Structure formats: C-alpha cells, structure tokens
Amino acid sequence: SDYNSEVVTAALAIYGNNKKYDEIENNILPYFNPVKHGPHATSNVLKYLKISEKYEDALYLIKNVSSLNWNQFTNEFIKYEDEFIQMKKNYEAANTNTNSGSKVLSISRPIWSNNFKNPTWALNMAEKTKPSLLILPFTNIGETSTSFPKELSIALPLFLNDELHYSSNLKYHLALTYNDKEFKVPKNNYNTDYIDYIKAQNPDLDYILSGNILSKWDKEDNRYELEVYIYDTNISTKTTLLKEHVDENSIVDLLPKLLNNLNLFFNGLIDFKTFETPDVENILLKPKKLEVLMDLDGYSRDRSWAYNKILYNAVNSVIESENDSARFDLVSLLHQIMQIHPQLLSKVKPLIYNLVGNGYFISEKSSKLLPLIFSIYSDEDNYNNFVESIRRGNPDYIEWINKFLYYTSNE
C-alpha cells in the first residue's frame, strides 16, 4: 500500500499480461486502495476480476469508486458495469428458469414523474379531449454502424411525449414495448394489418404518429433519412410531417420544424411555448435513462456509474435550460439516487447548492422543489426556512411534499 498509483498500475499490468494471477491475488489486492492508487490501477484490478469471474467483488468495487470524482472515466466504468452485470445475469440464469416476455409501457406524462409519487400539482391535469393520438416507436430500417438511429427511434417519441404533455390537452399516449433488458426498436415498417389491429383494439383512436429512420449510412456524411408521419385511422391516409436527412448535429435543428408542422396538422390545438434547442445528448439519453429508472432488468442497484452519467447530464440540462421540466428531472433523480446510490450525493452536492444559490430554482414551480432538495441532504436549517411557505402551498402540493420529508422541523 506504500507504492504510488504508477507502480501499482504497472505491476497489475505486468502480472496480468503474464497471467501471474496468483501474484495479483496475494501481492496486490490485499494492499490495493482505489482512493490512493487511482482509476488506472482500479481498471487493471477490474480486468483481473473479469478474468477470474469475480463479478460480485467487481460490482462492489465499481460502486465504491463511483463516489470519487473520476467523471472523465464514466463511460469506461459503465462498460465494466455492463460486463459484470451480464456475467451476474448469466450465473443467475443458469440457476433459475425465469423467462420474461415482452411488455408494453403506456405513458402520457414526462419520464421524470416515474416513481416520483404522482406530483399532480406540477403536471398538466386538464381533461384530455379528442382527437386521440397514439405515438409509436420509430422504425429503424437497414444496417447501421452507429447507435444513433436506434437511440433516436425511442428518444424522439419520448421527446414528443414530454412536449405534448405540457403543450396540449390532446388525448394521447406513447406506447413502448420492452423486455427485461431494453426498449424494443421495430425493424420493419408498420403495415396496414397492424394498424387495423390497433384500431380494432382502440375504436376511438383517431391518429397514429410514428416515423421511419432509414439507415443508408456512409462514412462520408454519416447521415440517416428521417421520416415522421401521422396516419389517420378513420380514413386510412398518411400525412408526412417531416422528411429530412439527419445526423447527431442536425437533429436538434429539425425539432422546431417538426413541432410546428405537428401543430399545423392539428389546427393550432398544440400551444408549444418558445422552444429551447436542447442538448442532443440529453435527447438521445432519454431511452437509456428511462430503462435505468424503470429498472427493466432488476439490476439498477449495480448501475452506479450509469446513474452518475444521468445525474451529471441532468445538472447540465438545468444550467442550459430555463424549462421547469429540467429541474423536476434533476430532483426526481436525486430522490431515486438517495434510495439506491446515496454515495453519489456528496460529490454532486456543491453543484446542486450552486444551482440553488445562483437562482436556478426561482420559478413558481421549481422553487417548490427546494424543501425536497434540503430534505435529501438532511439540511434542516435551510428546510426550516421554507416551513411557512410549505404550509401556505396548495393542498395537492402539501400532500405530495409530505411524502418526501424525512424529518420534522423543530418549529
């Protein structure tokens, strides 16, 4: 343990390359300290644990170091998480006979409200009216050499779900099919037989919104053809809302056009506010984020670095956006992290309190999240400053916030 990080990293690499695993087990691991020896040495330890198939030790180590400020290594540790979780799944599958099929998630609320104790006071609770609309995942047709089309197939419907919730009273739902691993991306166009089947199951359904992402990728321009359309189930006609070539840089520039065309189609029934061009990473991360928050595979407690990435993305979204939804997104995530990955809270606390101190939670809605932030961090002094404002809140808000407060004020 007296050796510095460079020596330990080199020793691990040499022993590993020469397959001297007993040397690692006997001479390195008993003295290994990730805080002292750093991320590179930790990575080499994880390589050894992978070879020796010690997935429990590896996942414990990965979770332990997620509390450290090693954010530049986030993607590397997420990769390790995925590998060791898969190893754990394989072991557990060999000892069980579980076989879960596909399920359907139907939502018409922002994804931040998932597992956030039904915050009706912060949602659009107006009565939904016709026409009725069903949003389906976009099809992803053709071979691709990047993850962009697959991510976009689910991310765009989730983006539209969030926008429509706040900006319209349309009777709409987003339907996503998923298994115990991920959301399913359709590989073929929706045919008329399938649409007729949906209509037969939902006689009051007026429209289906979906799209196709045609993967004619070539390394010179790295673009894909995106088509977004609405299908009228009553007269069996298709209207194209958008048809463009897109890549990761241009997709956000097309979103205002898509929203405008959608509003025109519905004759102004959708009241989109001033549109902020979001960070493309924030949009493309939506599917993975929802998969983690829903704990599709039951291993979210082992995904500390996945949560770490989502958390810092949520912080950046608050900085870049004036939208209240970004604030709710962050605080709902902090609430879930407190329950399953509390080790992440301390390192992000200075950022959270800087956001509070610099006025990022001053709108009428977002300011009501402050007591929850202070409660998460057991900050009784700041919490007490908001006691009276809580008592003056509307009944729905008071009932909701009381579900989260983990101690009682001294007042």
Regions from the language model: what does each represent?
Residues 2-10, 21-24, 35-44, 322-330, ...:
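Generic helix N-cap/helix-start motif at coil->alpha-helix transitions
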Residues 10-13, 43-47, 80-83, 87, ...:
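"A position-specific structural signal for the A-helix of alpha-solenoid helical repeats
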Residues 18-28, 52-61, 346:
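Structural signature of tandem alpha-helical TPR/SEL1-like repeats
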Residues 27-29, 61-62, 311-315, 349-356, ...:
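Inward-facing hydrophobic residues that define packing positions of alpha-helical scaffold repeats
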Residues 33-36, 50-73, 81-104, 353, ...:
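TPR/TPR-like (Sel1-like) alpha-helical repeat modules
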Residues 96-127, 235-363, 370-381:
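C-terminal/domain-edge helix-coil "capping" segments
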Residues 128-218, 279:
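Short beta-strand->alpha-helix linker/helix-N-cap micro-motif
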Residues 195-266:
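Amphipathic beta-strand/beta-sheet edge segments enriched in Tyr/Trp
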